[in-house]
From Swiss-Prot:
EC number in record: 3.1.3.11
Stored PANTHER family: FRUCTOSE-1,6-BISPHOSPHATASE-RELATED (PTHR11556), SEDOHEPTULOSE-1,7-BISPHOSPHATASE, CHLOROPLASTIC (PTHR11556:SF35)
Protein name per its UniProtKB record: Fructose-1,6-bisphosphatase class 1 2
Broadest EC class assigned to this enzyme: hydrolase
Disulfide bonds: none
InterPro entries: FBPase_C_dom (IPR044015), FBPase_class-1 (IPR000146), FBPase_N (IPR033391), FBPtase (IPR028343)
Organism (species): Paraburkholderia phymatum (strain DSM 17167 / CIP 108236 / LMG 21445 / STM815) (Burkholderia phymatum)
Record flagged with keyword Iron: no
UniProt record, GO biological process: fructose 1,6-bisphosphate metabolic process; fructose 6-phosphate metabolic process; fructose metabolic process; gluconeogenesis; sucrose biosynthetic process
Gene name tied to this protein: fbp2
Length: 357
């Protein structure tokens, strides 16, 4: 690997320095140094997580609760220990936590899923870590950690695959780093990543199609029809069941990653945790020129209220594909996608929606 590729810490120092000036969405001087330190700490923990994942089923404590795995517990413990050592992280929110866990008197709250795709571990399939950094407020009366505002200061993910990839944004583009064993850290390998303007891949679990809303069923059906249908080009379907891996492929190759609302059970009707999954990945994709939506509105504009585990449907990827799925939702709500049922022409009618390109 070429030595000209900057290390993560050097890149962050240069990348955040120009943001000390005032402006919309700008990280202030007080945050620039703190964010550099926290992102460096997260990257160091990602290295340790990658080493632990590489051990597979070797060693580790037995699961304490049904559904837990030894690997999942070990990875979560690494992230918690990092937050407790950090001078910059005031609190941590992980899946299953009732509220933000206070860790220090720092400036930031870290929202994270320490091991996305954990169910894939036994199959030796790619796993991930996803995170979002936001401002912390004053401590609450019960000693808890208060989250101040909804604006993200930084977001990113780690993908543990053939290589360990660390992808981040602080609002000035999306950038990817690869773990270099020889140099002992992450080096910049993907500067200013861009979602391709055209993509022909769908990341979706087709086994749940019967639970989707009609506009999603319409979109996926048209893609499956390929060049013989209204889309007039062929699509491929991929589904890893690891959101970080599916998002990374969409970021690199374009297309659409879909986690739609499902009707089968109300608590999971809206699929993805908003604060530590959906909005982190949405910001990364938008900073790379793509779009991210709930199907009805911009994902980054969605509000969680007081619920740190609020969930949302999620569609992200190539701009034109996200715009299409949003249009299908609007047409469905206006009743414009209903089949034309003329007793004279029925399915041969030119007025059916399928006949309109």
């Amino acid at each position: 690997m070429e030595c000209a590729q900057p290390a993560l810490s050097d890149f962050l120092a240069d990348h955040l320095a120009p943001r000390r000036a005032q402006g919309p969405g700008v990280v202030h001087a007080a945050d620039a140094e703190g964010l550099c330190a926290v992102i460096d700490e997260i990257a160091g923990t990602v290295k340790r997580i990658a080493a632990r994942i590489a051990q597979g089923a070797i060693g580790g404590a037995r699961p304490a609760m049904p559904g837990d795995t030894a690997l999942g517990i070990a990875v979560q413990d690494l992230l918690i220990a990092m937050c407790e050592r950090s001078a910059g992280i005031a609190g941590l929110v992980l899946p299953g936590m009732a509220a933000a866990r206070p860790t220090s008197a720092g400036r930031y709250v870290l929202f994270a899923d320490s091991l996305d795709g954990a169910a894939n571990a036994e199959s030796n399939v790619a796993l991930g870590t996803v995170f979002s950094i936001r401002h912390a407020g004053a401590a609450s009366a019960d000693g808890g950690c208060v989250i101040a505002g909804s604006r993200q200061l930084a977001a990113g993910y780690a993908l543990y695959g053939p290589a360990t990839i660390f992808v981040i944004t602080v609002g000035r583009g999306t950038h990817g780093f690869t773990l270099c064993r020889e140099r002992g850290g992450f080096v910049l390998t993907h500067r200013s990543m861009r979602v391709p303007e055209q993509g022909a891949e769908l990341a979706v679990n087709g086994g749940n199609e019967r639970f989707w809303e009609p506009p999603v069923q319409r979109y996926v059906s048209e893609c499956r029809d390929g060049s013989a249908g209204v889309r007039q080009r062929d699509f491929e379907t991929r589904w890893i069941a690891s959101l970080v891996a599916d998002t990374h492929r969409t970021l690199m190759r374009g297309g659409l990653c879909l986690l739609p609302r499902e009707s089968r059970c109300a608590p999971r009707a809206a699929r993805q945790p908003l604060l530590y999954h959906a909005q982190a990945l949405a910001w990364l994709v938008e900073q790379a020129g793509g779009l991210a939506s709930t199907g009805r509105a911009r994902l980054l504009d969605a509000a969680a209220g007081q619920d740190t585990h609020a969930r949302t449907p999620m569609f992200l990827g190539t701009r034109c594909e996200v715009e299409r799925i949003e249009r299908y939702h609007r047409e469905h709500e206006r009743g414009e996608d209903l089949p034309f049922t003329s007793p004279l022409f029925n399915e041969r009618s030119l007025f059916r929606p399928e006949a309109r390109v």
